[in-house]
């Protein structure tokens, strides 16, 4: 699994003050730009992209509809994405597919999309349909994060991931069953076919996230050779 860690500055000075040494063991940086006022995102961008030069960066605008901190119309949402992409060409762009489906046609030329779906209330009954619809579009990554209400919800998310990965071996998935109940899914990526796991450093960006240090210890244990 590749490890993703968020940076969530609320203003330019916070972006400038980020200690990049904390991110040495992280594979990808997710810039959660939704913690900024919409008019400040482009102004803060140089601090992020210059500070993390050499690291792969995910540009994410997580809107309130999917558990984020910014309210945007779909057109505002896609316009900010386009502006950031035109200037900085981030390695990945997170696109909230079902929330902003009306402007998805404007994203068809983007080769680096993470099509994402977040549900902080439940694991919906139509989860398999969500997997299917996004997988058919063949983005760089299909990301699904849902909240379990039962152990079966956790198993369903993991089983769907394994099934879709088996049928679509070239497609990358990043799937999460959130909260304490779903934490197992964050550690099982290599088994179920989820390529990325999201961790926290200074601040948690999703329910059930573990710290980078804890994740490193867990991965070390999972990879131990225990043969006699």
Curated annotation (Swiss-Prot):
GO terms for biological process: 3,4-dihydroxybenzoate biosynthetic process; amino acid biosynthetic process; aromatic amino acid family biosynthetic process; chorismate biosynthetic process. Gene3D superfamilies: Aldolase class I. One of its GO terms (molecular function) is 3-dehydroquinate dehydratase activity. Pathway: Metabolic intermediate biosynthesis; chorismate biosynthesis; chorismate from D-erythrose 4-phosphate and phosphoenolpyruvate: step 3/7. The keyword Cell membrane does not apply. Pfam families: DHquinase_I (PF01487). Its EC number is 4.2.1.10. It is an enzyme of class 4 (lyase). Keywords: Amino-acid biosynthesis, Aromatic amino acid biosynthesis, Lyase, Schiff base. It catalyses: 3-dehydroquinate = 3-dehydroshikimate + H2O. Homodimer. This is 3-dehydroquinate dehydratase. It comes from Streptococcus pyogenes serotype M1.
């Amino acid at each position: 699994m590749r490890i993703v860690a968020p940076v969530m500055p609320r203003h330019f000075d916070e972006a400038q003050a980020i200690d990049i040494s904390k991110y040495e063991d992280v594979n990808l940086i997710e810039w959660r730009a939704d913690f900024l006022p919409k008019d400040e995102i482009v102004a803060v961008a140089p601090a992020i992209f210059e500070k993390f030069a050499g690291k792969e960066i995910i540009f994410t605008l997580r809107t309130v509809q999917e558990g984020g901190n910014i309210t945007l119309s779909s057109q505002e949402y896609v316009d900010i994405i386009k502006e950031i992409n035109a200037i900085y060409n981030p390695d990945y762009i997170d696109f909230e597919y079902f929330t902003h489906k009306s402007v998805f046609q404007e994203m068809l030329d983007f080769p680096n999309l993470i099509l994402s779906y977040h549900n902080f209330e439940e694991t919906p009954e139509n989860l398999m349909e969500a997997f299917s619809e996004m997988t058919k579009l063949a983005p760089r990554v299909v990301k699904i994060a849902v909240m379990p209400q039962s152990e079966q919800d956790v198993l369903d998310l993991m089983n769907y991931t394994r099934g879709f990965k088996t049928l679509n071996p070239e497609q990358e998935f990043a799937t999460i069953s959130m909260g304490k109940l779903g934490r197992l899914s964050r550690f099982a990526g290599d088994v179920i076919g989820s390529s990325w796991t999201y961790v926290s450093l200074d601040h948690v960006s999703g329910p059930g996230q573990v710290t980078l240090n804890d994740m490193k210890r867990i991965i070390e244990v999972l990879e131990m050779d225990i043969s006699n």
